[in-house]
Amino acid sequence: MENSDADHGQAAREADARRRLMEAGAASLPRAPWLHGGRPPSAADLIDFALWRAGNDDVDESVVMAALTLLPAARAEVDQAEAALMFTARARGLSWPRISRAMGLASAQAAQQRFGRVTGRVENRRGEA
């Protein structure tokens, strides 16, 4: 029960952070062609926006706090992208040695282990949702 309450609290904080960054100007950014319909910008894109604003403006601290709040969501997005890329690479017939070289890993075994860790994190997050 405590985990569920903490998850709901984090989700509410992330929603508030997204709203704050959209109000701070992220809503007017051009849409990436791969974002269909009403899909919002990624947490990573919103963090990049906050960093850009902080480097170019005297930005309100709430923008920086909102970006910090989105760091766990951005990490989750990167995990999902990494898992999807590795699935895609294997589906396209790429070998583990080639995948490991592309990712800068020491061996095929390291790539397989990383795949297991990343997909495990993604699945754990889905199970918590």
Feature annotation, model-predicted:
Residues 92-129:
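Short, Lys/Arg-rich amphipathic alpha-helical interaction segments
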